[in-house]
Amino acid sequence: KTTSTYTVACQQLLNPIAGSDVSFKEEWWNEWEIRPYTLNAYIMCDPAHSRKKGSNRTAIAVVGIDANYNKFLLDGVCHRLSLSERWEALKMFRTKWKRAPGIREVKIGYERYGAQSDIEHFKEMMRIDGSSFPVYELNWTGGGGSQSKQDRIQRLEPDLKDGSFFFPFPTDEKRLTSHQKDYKIKKQEFLISKKILRKNEEGKVYDLVDWVKKNEYMLFPTIHPDFLDALSRIYDMDAMPPISRTRRSLEPDAEARY
């Protein structure tokens, strides 16, 4: 993997300032039209504990890992959520992706800072719902504050630069690409990328991927790069590629269209 510019600045140039203003380049933004059939899915939550305007947003990112360690943004949310809304969102994403064809494993990680009371609430809700699943605390040894968040996010750079991190293509269902049409004919529409449309705390619908690209990715380091921070937590999840359940697959995996 390529070493990040930030790491080079810190380790070789002995000058972290030289790398601190590094932004993510537009040409590093790669999109997927068709996801690989077999993936492990990781749900990472970076919670915000205020719904006040101008405060940080709760970011939940669902990232799939394929057999080659490529990473695919599959789903998510980025707006202000109450504790009960965070629980409902996590439960929804877990249920959705455990049921999705080809998904081998689903794990949930939750930002450790301030997480204990949240996780206690989740355990109580599981008891009430009659369900149980682990929520892993995501630790970070680099301290706190905005600089720490920037350091975490910088870990995305090598994968972005190498072309191994992919965002959903903004599919228009009325104008499918030729590759997507092939999968529709094969009745595998579930592998086709879709816009991730969410409704924020004000009831307004937003396109998650478009919002993240314009407000976080292209402006990094920005004031509130909440979703990028959640994405970077994939490196704290001990994420592993999926292991085939059979020695010889009866049907070959779909090739991802990048």
Please report, for each region that a protein language model flagged, where it lies by residue.
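Metal-dependent nuclease catalytic cores in nucleic-acid-processing enzymes
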Residues: F93-W97, L228, S232-D238
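ATPase catalytic-site recognition across NTP-hydrolyzing enzymes
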Residues: K1-P47
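A residue-level signal for conserved active-site and pocket-lining positions in enzyme catalytic cores
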Residues: Q12, L156, A230
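An active-site-proximal beta-strand-loop segment
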Residues: C45-T58
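Mg2+-dependent endonuclease catalytic cores in nucleic-acid-processing enzymes, primarily RNase H-like
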Residues: N15, G19-D21, A59, D66-N215, ...
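Acidic two-metal-ion nuclease catalytic site recognized across multiple nuclease folds
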Residues: R233-Y258
